[in-house]
């Protein structure tokens, strides 16, 4: 019995020993083959992988003027595996001028996978970005006391000008979504957020380099691993040359002070955008440094939406500028001829429907209808097109033919400009009206679209592109703001001609109408210019005051610039649109404004539209008025007080003064 018990114990003890050895073998296998934590730990003690950031590409205007460049900056990086429990937190915070609460929160955020998806305790993580030179100097002197913390040299953007914020855009620290979308980025990297900085991010950013450095047992750098055999040099980003003319852009922004709206100028011969103004705007120089987030938050909360690029994101009724597209459609489709005349008795009257018009001679033909901007002419044209049964089976077919013309002119779809956020506008089709009117509609139902009202909306860019298309007599290039990318050919999408459905003859008559408008019609303010300008006004109806719109180009027979101006609540097209458009033409073609032009520009710059007391410019005006009123009140009160004081009375002769 005792022998059996002894044998039993021996097996039990042996089994336990085998189990223990098996566990150790499995654990060893897991550590060595299944997990690389120990390898990473060993490597992190022996090597330091240092990322070298490339210089981001510079940005120039079309004349070679520097717009955006780089400036040295310093970031504090931390390797958590080295820093844990090895620094004096108070001394560290004092060296950087931060609070202990900030230090604790920042360290927690770094280790939070939700906020920092690429976190690893063995690699460098961003602790603090964009130190000033003074902060860097103070920290560098004491850095040896803070193991695990390193200084990373990089560059940040600087903007040479206060103009062109919506074109240039800005850069900011990557978000978790950016990191997830592109594994090139790591926490703390920078990425283009708006404008060309975003659209051309891959061209501008370059390629990161890397240095592998050797460290001793105390973590001190001993030099490059294998003399840099495994290092990779950073590749600088490519420079961009914009199509923007800085002087023209600056003039446009000056003219739009105190107004909401947009100016877009295009070179019809290339599709290059010469100027793109969106008002109100902001100074791009406030979107750099550690205050960027705060300033961006303030701008995004601003009721007047200064971050919105109205040139490509604003969808507006084009008003009477749209009549040019209708003339092209009616003529090409044979609905009208140059001699076709329609009645206008202060408007369009048909079967109880009335669309108003201003007073002018009637009946009126095509060229004069464009020159005087007759509403009735274009309403009659659409009415007869929708009702023409010799050409179209029904209004449904006629409507879709009409829409095909509009789409061929670049309406209803994104033009494809090289900026993020472009909107497509709205061009209705027959299906749209069938849905909304349950199949019960005709030419009278939709007649307002013929004069750029109703459901039709365009962006200012699309209106300017219409001007460029007319200037070219029937084709356009995709508008673009980048003229050249360093060492790269221009994208073929920007060199391809897009032809419209309208014929050349119809364009010649529309040009004649726009030239007549500039000489004696609604755009006659352009007649002062020393070159042949062509234009078309628009007064787009609105719930409040009408919008002031202009579209034109110059010179007539060798077009160099096409312009669209849109001023919200500006009233008649001739009030704001025409003078601003004329000044933009004059500046670009002549290189400067004449004395008369300068006087007009000065007057236009200081004209304000009453959007409300909180609109930029209105605040200063209201504050000045309030200050003047207070001063006047104080002066009146002082005078009243003086009047109430007893006046001295001279003693009469013989009386003794008391």
Kindly label every feature range from the protein language model:
Residues 1-293, 315, 398-408, 450, ...:
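Periplasmic/cell-envelope proteins involved in peptidoglycan metabolism and beta-lactam response
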Residues 208, 540-543, 607-610:
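Short acidic/His-enriched helical or mixed secondary-structure segments at domain edges of catalytic enzymes
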Residues 216-221, 225-231, 269-321, 325-573, ...:
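Beta-lactam-recognizing serine transpeptidase/beta-lactamase-like catalytic domain environment
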Residues 489-493, 600-609:
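Intrinsically disordered, low-complexity charged/polar segments
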């Amino acid at each position: 019995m005792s022998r059996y018990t002894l044998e039993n114990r021996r097996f039990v003890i042996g089994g336990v020993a085998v189990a223990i050895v098996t566990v150790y073998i499995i654990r060893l296998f897991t550590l060595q083959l299944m997990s690389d934590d120990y390898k990473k730990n060993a490597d992190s003690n022996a090597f330091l992988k240092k990322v070298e950031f490339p210089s981001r590409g510079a940005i120039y205007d079309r004349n070679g003027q520097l717009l955006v460049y780089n400036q040295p900056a310093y970031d504090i990086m931390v390797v958590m595996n080295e820093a844990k429990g090895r620094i004096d937190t108070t001394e560290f915070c004092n060296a950087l001028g931060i609070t202990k609460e900030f230090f604790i929160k920042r360290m927690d955020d770094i280790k939070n996978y939700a906020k920092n998806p690429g976190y690893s305790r063995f690699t460098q993580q961003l602790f603090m970005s964009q130190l000033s030179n003074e902060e860097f100097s103070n920290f560098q002197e004491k850095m040896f006391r803070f193991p695990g913390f390193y200084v990373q040299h990089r560059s940040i953007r600087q903007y040479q000008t206060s103009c062109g914020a919506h074109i240039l855009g800005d850069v900011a620290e990557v978000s978790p979504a950016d990191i997830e979308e592109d594994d090139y980025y790591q926490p703390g990297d920078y990425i283009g957020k708006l404008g060309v900085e975003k659209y051309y991010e891959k061209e501008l950013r370059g390629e990161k380099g890397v240095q592998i450095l050797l460290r001793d047992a105390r973590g001190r750098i001993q030099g490059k691993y294998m003399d840099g055999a495994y290092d990779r040099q950073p590749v600088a980003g490519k420079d961009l040359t914009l199509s923007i003319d800085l002087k023209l852009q600056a003039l446009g922004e000056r003219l739009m002070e105190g107004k909401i709206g947009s100016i877009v100028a295009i070179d019809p011969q290339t599709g290059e955008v010469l100027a793109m103004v969106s008002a109100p705007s902001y100074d791009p120089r406030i979107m750099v440094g550690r205050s960027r987030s705060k300033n961006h938050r303030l701008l995004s909360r601003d009721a007047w939406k200064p971050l919105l690029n109205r040139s490509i994101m604003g969808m507006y009724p084009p008003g009477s500028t749209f009549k040019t597209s209708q003339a092209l459609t009616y003529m090409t489709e044979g609905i009208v001829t140059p001699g076709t005349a329609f009645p206008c008795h202060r408007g369009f009257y048909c079967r109880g429907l009335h669309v108003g018009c201003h007073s002018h001679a009637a009946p009126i033909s095509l060229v004069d209808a464009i020159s005087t901007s007759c509403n009735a002419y274009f309403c009659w044209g659409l009415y007869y097109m929708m009702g023409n049964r010799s050409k179209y089976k029904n209004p449904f077919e006629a409507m879709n033919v009409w829409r095909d013309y509009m789409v061929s002119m670049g309406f209803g779809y994104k033009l494809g400009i090289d900026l993020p956020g472009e909107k497509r506008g709205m061009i209705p089709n027959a299906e749209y009206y069938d849905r909304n009117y349950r199949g019960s509609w005709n030419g009278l139902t939709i007649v307002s679209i013929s004069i750029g009202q109703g459901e039709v909306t365009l962006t200012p860019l699309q209106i300017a592109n219409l001007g460029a298309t007319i200037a070219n007599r029937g084709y356009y290039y995709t508008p673009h703001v980048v003229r050249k990318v360093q060492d790269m050919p221009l994208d073929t999408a920007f060199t391809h001609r897009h032809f419209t459905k309208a014929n050349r003859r119809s364009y010649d008559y529309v040009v004649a109408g726009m030239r007549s408008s500039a000489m004696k019609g609604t755009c006659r303010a352009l007649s002062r210019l020393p070159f042949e300008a062509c234009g078309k006004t628009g007064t787009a109806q609105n719930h409040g005051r009408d919008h002031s719109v202009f579209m034109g180009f110059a010179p007539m027979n060798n077009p160099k610039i096409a312009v669209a101006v849109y001023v919200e609540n500006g009233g008649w097209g001739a009030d704001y649109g025409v003078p601003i458009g004329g000044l933009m033409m004059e500046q670009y073609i002549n290189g400067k404004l004449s004395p008369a032009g300068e006087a007009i520009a000065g007057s236009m710059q200081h004209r304000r539209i009453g959007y409300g007391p909180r609109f930029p410019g209105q605040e200063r005006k209201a504050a000045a008025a309030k200050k003047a009123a207070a001063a006047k009140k104080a002066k009146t009160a002082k005078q009243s007080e003086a009047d109430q004081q007893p006046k001295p009375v001279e003693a009469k002769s013989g009386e003794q003064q008391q």
